[in-house]
UniProtKB/Swiss-Prot annotation:
PANTHER family: AROM/DEHYDROQUINATE SYNTHASE, PENTAFUNCTIONAL AROM POLYPEPTIDE. It is found in: Cytoplasm. Keywords: Amino-acid biosynthesis, Aromatic amino acid biosynthesis, Cytoplasm, Transferase. Pfam families: EPSP_synthase. GO terms for cellular component: cytoplasm. This is 3-phosphoshikimate 1-carboxyvinyltransferase. It catalyses: 3-phosphoshikimate + phosphoenolpyruvate = 5-O-(1-carboxyvinyl)-3-phosphoshikimate + phosphate. It is an enzyme of class 2 (transferase). Belongs to the EPSP synthase family. It comes from Erwinia tasmaniensis (strain DSM 17950 / CFBP 7177 / CIP 109463 / NCPPB 4357 / Et1/99).
């Protein structure tokens, strides 16, 4: 019997949420701290499945760290160079793309014989474009099951040079190469093939690398030049900013049924592209207030939008359920990379939106959503995808309850999401 959670209709949301740390920032910072010279103290680290997978992998490789009781503060003793596995290892990385891709590249610099594997869904998430680029740089990588997909066996060997990487499927492939390249014996020139998706995530990578003392020459996101034989330097204390993708659910709830909801831990200067989700809510008719360390959203009469959402792929999912409460047909374009995430999010989203009564057209890289006259009760399948569960919680802002199957899947990035939502909610 699958776990489920039924949310009763919510009349009003109001209050403040202190956001958990960003997943994207947490896992990048952990890896860079592990590669750096010196000890780094990370605060507001996200405690979630994806981050635990990264921590477990680093420990297995021999990285020493200590965690606070609540797992949000981590002191990491850097290796001062590549990760070298002393004996053959198998690392289980769950469904954490932010651990699988960067670790695969980082382990191509060191010595060792490491197998990287994960949950069944991880074995369906493409990694061929990254492996192709690593092999061009001399890395020894083999596929253990299906060509172009994990599990992988990695045996080091990446020495730099010119490598071409396809940027059109996932920006994580480029992120992985960028973070590993400074430790290679030679300079690396990365050439991007195709249109680079999710550019703001590359900005997160470059900003974090700079925090740890390494600067990359970025030529308009077409080519990147990284000097070899560099060393990351520990940063004594680093505060992980709040997760902007996680903020999207609370800001959207306020736009639909506020009151006002204020999220803290991110603000106008945040490095995460997903803060621009708030701009979309504003275009739809909500009012948004920006502070240095907060974003606040207040209800407005919402109208449909037709937008390219390539720059905010994760937060854009939240617009799909917000569209249920907007006048007119909302169209979200240039979101092909939804298909290679935790599940095929385009198909999953279309399927579940139809259950609550919406009229949906699903294209190769777009979705259009016309809300029903009245939202109907449904049991929502979540496809072991944390964002499906959180997005569809917004259905409870209607006059109908909603049942979320497998609600615990939010543990991937936000274990206490439903408790936080309940804290802000006044039931009808």
């Amino acid at each position: 019997m699958q776990d489920s959670l039924t949310l009763q209709p919510i009349a009003l949301v109001d209050g403040t949420v202190n956001l958990p740390g960003s997943k994207s920032v947490s896992n990048r910072a952990l890896l860079l701290a592990a590669l750096a010279e010196g000890t780094t103290r990370l605060t507001n680290l996200l405690d979630s499945d994806d981050v635990r997978h990264m921590l477990d992998a680093l420990k297995a490789i021999g990285v020493k760290y200590s965690l606070s009781a609540d797992r949000t503060c981590c002191e990491i003793v850097g290796q001062g160079g590549p990760l070298n596995a002393k004996e053959p290892l198998e690392l289980f990385l769950g469904n954490a793309g932010t651990a699988m891709r960067p670790l695969a590249a980082a382990l191509c610099i060191g010595n060792g014989d490491v197998v990287l594997t994960g949950e069944p869904r991880m074995k369906e998430r493409p990694i061929g474009h990254l492996v192709d680029a690593l092999r061009q740089g001399g890395a020894e990588v083999e596929y253990l099951e299906q060509e172009n997909y994990p599990p992988l066996r990695v045996k080091g060997g990446f020495s730099g040079g010119e490598v071409t990487v396809n940027g059109s499927v996932s920006s994580q492939f480029l992120t992985a190469l960028l973070m590993a390249a400074p430790l290679a014996p030679n300079d690396t020139r990365i050439v991007i093939k195709g249109d680079l998706v999710s550019k703001p995530y590359i900005d997160i990578t470059l900003k974090l690398m700079a925090t740890f003392g390494v600067v990359v020459e970025n030529n308009d996101y077409d080519t990147f030049h990284i000097s070899g034989q560099q060393q990351y330097q520990a940063t004594r204390e680093y505060l992980v900013e709040g997760d902007a993708s996680s903020a999207s659910y609370f800001l959207a709830a306020a736009a639909i049924k506020g009151g006002t909801v204020k999220v803290t831990g991110i603000g106008r200067n945040s490095m995460q592209g997903d803060i621009h989700f708030a701009d979309v809510l504003e275009k739809m008719g909500a009012s948004v207030e920006w502070g240095d360390d907060y974003i606040a959203c207040t209800r407005g009469d919402l109208n449909a939008v037709d937008l390219d959402m390539n720059h905010i792929p994760d937060a854009a999912m939240t617009i799909a359920t917000t569209a249920l409460f907007a006048q007119g047909t909302t169209v979200m374009r240039n979101i092909y990379n939804w298909r290679v995430k935790e599940t095929d999010r385009l198909t999953a989203m279309a399927t579940e939106l139809r259950k609550v009564g919406a009229e949906v057209e699903e294209g190769h890289d777009f979705i259009s959503i016309t809300p029903p006259a009245k939202i109907v009760f449904a049991e929502i399948g979540t496809y072991n995808d944390h964002r499906m569960a959180m997005c569809f919680s917004l259905v409870a802002l209607s006059s109908s309850p909603v049942t979320i199957l497998d609600p615990k899947c939010t543990a991937k990035t936000f274990p206490d999401y439903f408790e936080q939502l309940a804290r802000l909610s006044h039931l009808a």
